[in-house]
């Protein structure tokens, strides 16, 4: 009995680099080198950037393996950062963070209490005074999360009891997305006094352009926070299970059924691409909530839109400049990032990936509609195209 088991183990391959595996480490079969790399990355809060397109070859025969892609591969195959025992911080923490699951952040800065019902991040007032917009966004986001608990509460559910996340169908995803439009627009007005003072038509242009990418980007960010990249998290806390798209599209309320083969051909590549280009890089960067707010600010105040006025362009430029200055202060004084410019560039580089991912999904839906391959509701098309 012992002999065959030993023999089988010899031939197991590391899920990351294809070297001979040493055993099951942090949720995946891995060699000693990849397990040590993952442990060092998580425990030391290391961040990496890829010089390519986040798709480098990380097999053992590569001489200078891309560390960013190696870490992404670790996450892809199931390695869980929460499984790495964290070092105790050397001094009293400056920032208290509580979230659904612990993320990988600087241990000398952040502490992780028991998970509460929503994501909250607090910094001392001496720092928040230097980050007025970002701190206001954090406070209003907490209000948004609490409002969502009420809005998306199931009939008869206790508002004080945490929702147990479960997979949703596309009909429920539409319902949650459309319900969240008004809440999100209110959140934007709470965050930015300048937005509140814009004319109605300028508000509509900015918000309609930003909502769908934001909806997808937030889902990817919350997936990163939960360490479940295969789950695109919805506003309610429920999620789209990208490993079971058949149940997502072929729900009992569907207007028309579609085969698993067609789902894999039409929709799976777009979902996989979004995870690989957005969610996994967020996990690799260990993106935090303030950095997410910066991404949303840049997404909302898109001064390249041809429909917006010169005044709106001027206001948007001013807001983005201020927020980037606050991010620089945050990185230098709170997170203690050694190279804040490099990290900022890597974070901002996520925006094109978000936009491309959303456009790819929109294109797929348009193809299914034009060629009558799948009949989704008008609400679904409108939500994904920003027409609401």
UniProtKB/Swiss-Prot annotation:
Residues 11-86 bind DNA. GO terms for biological process: regulation of transcription by RNA polymerase II. GO terms for cellular component: nucleus. A zinc finger (NR C4-type) spans 14-34, 50-74. GO terms for molecular function: DNA-binding transcription factor activity; RNA polymerase II cis-regulatory region sequence-specific DNA binding; zinc ion binding. Pfam families: Hormone_recep, zf-C4. SUPFAM superfamilies: Glucocorticoid receptor-like (DNA-binding domain) (SSF57716), Nuclear receptor ligand-binding domain (SSF48508). Signal peptide: none annotated. Residues 115-387 form the NR LBD domain. Keywords: DNA-binding, Metal-binding, Nucleus, Receptor, Transcription, Transcription regulation, Zinc, Zinc-finger. The keyword Transcription regulation applies. It is found in: Nucleus. Belongs to the nuclear hormone receptor family. Orphan nuclear receptor. This is Nuclear hormone receptor family member nhr-16. It comes from Caenorhabditis elegans. The gene is nhr-16.
């Amino acid at each position: 009995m012992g002999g065959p088991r030993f023999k089988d183990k010899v031939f197991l391959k590391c899920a990351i680099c294809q070297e001979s595996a040493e055993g099951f480490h942090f949720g995946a079969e891995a060699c000693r080198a990849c397990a040590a790399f993952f442990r060092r990355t998580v425990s030391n809060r290391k961040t990496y950037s890829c010089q390519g397109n986040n798709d480098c070859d990380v097999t053992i025969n590569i001489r200078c393996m891309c560390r960013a892609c190696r870490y992404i591969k670790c996450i892809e195959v199931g390695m869980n950062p929460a499984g790495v025992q964290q070092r105790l911080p050397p001094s009293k923490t400056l920032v208290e963070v509580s979230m659904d699951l612990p993320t990988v952040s600087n241990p000398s800065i952040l502490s992780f209490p028991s998970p509460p019902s929503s994501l909250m991040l607090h910094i001392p007032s001496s720092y928040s005074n230097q980050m007025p917009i970002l701190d206001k966004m954090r406070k209003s986001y907490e209000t948004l999360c609490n409002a969502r608990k009420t809005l998306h509460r199931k009939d008869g559910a206790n508002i004080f009891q945490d929702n147990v996340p479960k997979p949703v169908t596309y009909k429920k995803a539409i319902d949650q997305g459309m319900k969240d439009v008004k809440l999100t627009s209110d959140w934007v007005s709470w965050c930015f006094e300048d937005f509140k003072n814009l004319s109605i038509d300028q508000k509509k242009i900015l918000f309609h352009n930003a909502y769908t990418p934001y909806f997808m980007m937030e889902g990817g960010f919350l997936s990163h926070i939960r360490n479940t990249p295969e789950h695109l998290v919805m506003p309610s806390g429920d999620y789209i299970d990208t490993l079971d798209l058949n149940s997502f599209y072929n729900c009992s309320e569907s207007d028309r059924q579609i085969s698993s083969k067609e789902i894999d051909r039409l929709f799976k590549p777009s979902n996989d691409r979004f995870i690989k280009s957005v969610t996994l890089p967020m996990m690799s960067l260990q993106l935090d909530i303030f950095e997410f707010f910066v991404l949303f600010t840049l997404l909302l105040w898109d001064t390249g839109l041809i429909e917006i006025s010169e005044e709106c362009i001027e206001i948007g430029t001013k807001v983005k400049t201020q927020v980037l200055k606050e991010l620089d202060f945050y990185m230098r004084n709170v997170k203690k990032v050694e190279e804040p410019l490099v990290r900022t560039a890597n974070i901002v580089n996520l925006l094109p990936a978000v936009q491309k991912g959303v456009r790819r999904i929109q294109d797929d839906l348009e193809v299914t509609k034009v060629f009558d391959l799948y009949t989704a509701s008008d609400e679904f098309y409108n939500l994904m195209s920003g027409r609401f």
